[in-house]
Structures are given as structure tokens and as C-alpha cells.
Amino acid sequence: RIERLAAQLQNQICFYGAYQKNILRAGVVLFIHRDVVHAQYSAGDNNRDDGSLDLLLDFVIKKYNPEKVFSFGTSSEEFGSRLNKGLLYWKESFRSCNDTQPFYSIETKNYYLLENRLR
């Protein structure tokens, strides 16, 4: 669960919310690393026209800039085989640039082969 992970990684995982009259309108869970802030989960309410998620992300980007790079995460689906053009367009509205990334599938029984490479 995310609560358990956040408890183990204090100051590295945090939640920001945008509220209107004490009602949560948008939220984002950030994973904070030495050089990068990564938006792991973000969501707005059903009324996307109010811009609450846009406002919230603008706030967190400005909060961590220029010390860290802000990562919106992937814009693809189905293990990178399909680009979500709407999501990419939305991210680019924040002047983000996109890049491709490889996807790998590794049997969990072979995890030990990666231990020294991921540190």
C-alpha cells in the first residue's frame, strides 16, 4: 500500500491536493529523488474544465524548480506500444518535452541478476 511505502520513505513520497471549499478537486502523489520529482499518480475530479489539476501541477512544478527536474511519467499505454496522444498533448501544455523509453520484462526469479546494476 502507498501509505506503508510513504512511511518507509518519509520525505520522498508526498501528496498534494487542490481543494475548493474543503472538497478535494485534484491530487498528485510525488516521488521525490535527489534530482527528480516524479508525478506517480495524478487525478482531477470529473469536471476537468475547472483546471484544478492544471493549477495543482503548476504549483508543484514551481515549488521544486529549478532544483529538480519534474517528470510527468509515461504517456504510453500497453507497455509502451501505444501513445496516449491526449495525455501527451496535456503534458506538452506545461512545456514538457517527451522522450521514449524502453520496456523490459524480467522473470521475477531472475531479479538477483539486476541487483548490482540498479544501485
Question: Where are the predicted features?
Answer:
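Short, contiguous acidic/charged loop-to-helix segments that flank catalytic cores in large enzymes
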Residues: 43-50, 76-81
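Residue-level detector of alpha-helical recognition elements and their boundaries
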Residues: 37, 54, 105-106
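Alpha-helical elements of Rossmann-like donor-binding domains used by nucleotide-donor carbohydrate transfer enzymes
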Residues: 4, 55-59, 86
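Solvent-exposed, flexible loop/coil residues
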Residues: 1, 41, 59, 94, ...
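Active-site/acyl-donor-binding loops of N-acyltransferases
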Residues: 67-119
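A conserved beta-strand-loop-helix scaffold within acyl/acetyltransferase catalytic domains
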Residues: 1-48, 64
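Conserved acetyl-CoA-binding loop-helix of GNAT-fold acetyltransferases
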Residues: 48-62
